[in-house]
Structures are given as structure tokens and as C-alpha cells.
């Protein structure tokens, strides 16, 4: 098993915390084609082949779309979508040889676009479409493609998300930031509370990914967490007008003074 990490220290920490004797790591920047090609060459030459590729790298940039500039939006797509496609393209020759699996990790937000997570939702929708197209294109070659969509899981990402949301407001014109500040603060606090209350653990997520890699007949989609499954079902069944009403509580305090209770 080869884990891709951004930094050497991340890889060493992973090895120290893992009890898997066969776990190794490689430093990979999925937004750099040279780094991605080096990863594929390492797998081919050192390990001789590849049975499965799990694309789990991602960033989440929260905030009103009015506060997210083009460079930030492109970064969201570059990491969460383009980088995943680069990894797939580089490793496909190995996967075709083994009739292997590709597992793309998306999110419950690949089913419905939530206010203040528009950039992230756009990336997840794109990754869902990417996965659907790949699944159909690669089926004749024996390479199977699945999506795993986790819901809220208590991990350090939520602290990073809150900090990124605060930076998005800090970088926006003051009048624009003031318009959204109260609503966004309430939204970020609600997200953190939802993650703390979630019963889905990282181990639950890992088991779901393992199923996608090993099921005799892998499904197109797997969900890790009741909230992710509920989001997908709600988005599929409700008309847009009712979905808009469902999310109205999030934006109810847009325009309210900072510190106002964000509940409607």
C-alpha cells in the first residue's frame, strides 16, 4: 500500500500511527504533472503494478461565492478535480493491465449545492460527472470506477475550513464581508457541531473505501454516513423550490449585523 502525502513529515507521522507493516508513502503534488508522473513510475518500477487507485486529496474553501476570487476558485478545482484526473491518466496503463479499480472520493455535497460551500460543491459535482464518464469509458477495458461520498466526519479538516472561511471574508471588500459575516459565522459553527455529533468515524469511511476496492461487483456509488445518503436522496427527490427552502435557514442572516444569532 502506497500513500500519497504532501510533505515528508506527514508521511512519517502516518507510518508512526499505522500498524500496517506494508504501508509506504510517497510525496506527491497532484497539481504538478512531473510529480504525478514520478508517482506512476515509482509504482511501476518498485512495486511492479497497481490494483487500485484511491483519489482522496482535496481542499475545502468555504465562503460566499462573491468573496471567492478566480484564483481561489481555480485552486479548488485544480486540487479536487484536475489533480485527480492527472493521477488517473498517469496510472491508467497499470490499472488496465491488472483490471484494477479507481475510487474517487467526493462528498455529500456532490449531490446538492449548499450556500457558502459553492466552490467546494462545484468541485464535487465536477468529480461526480468525471467519475460517471470514466466509469462508462473504461468499462470495456475492465477498469471499474466507483465514487465514495462521505458525510461529516470529525477530523482536523473542520478547523482548517473555519480558518479558510474567515480568510475569505478578510480578503473581501469590507462592505461585502459585513453583508455575509453573521450568516457565515453561524454556518461554520453549525458545520463544526455537525461534525462533532457525527457517528461516522474515519474507520467507517476506510471500510467503505475497502468495499469499493474489493466488492466482486462494485457499485457506482457508496455512501459513508447517514447524512451523505440523506443528502443524495433529498437532492434527488425534492424539486429545486423545496431545496431552496431547505437551505434558506443558512442564508437567513445575510445582511444582519455581526454577532446576530444566525438562526432564523
PLM feature spans:
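Conserved glycine-rich Rossmann-like NAD(P)H-binding loop of the short-chain dehydrogenase/reductase
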Residues: 1-12
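The beta1-alpha1 cofactor-binding region of Rossmann-like NAD(H)/NADP(H)-dependent oxidoreductases
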Residues: 28-41, 70
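Substrate-binding pocket helix/loop in short-chain dehydrogenase/reductase
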Residues: 64-65, 72-74
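Active-site helix of classical SDR
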Residues: 88, 123-126
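A short, exposed helix-loop element centered on a Lys and neighboring polar residues
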Residues: 88-89, 132
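Residue(s) in the substrate-gating loop at a strand-loop-helix junction
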Residues: 107
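C-terminal beta-strand-loop-alpha-helix "lid" module of Rossmann-like NAD(P)-dependent dehydrogenases
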Residues: 140-195
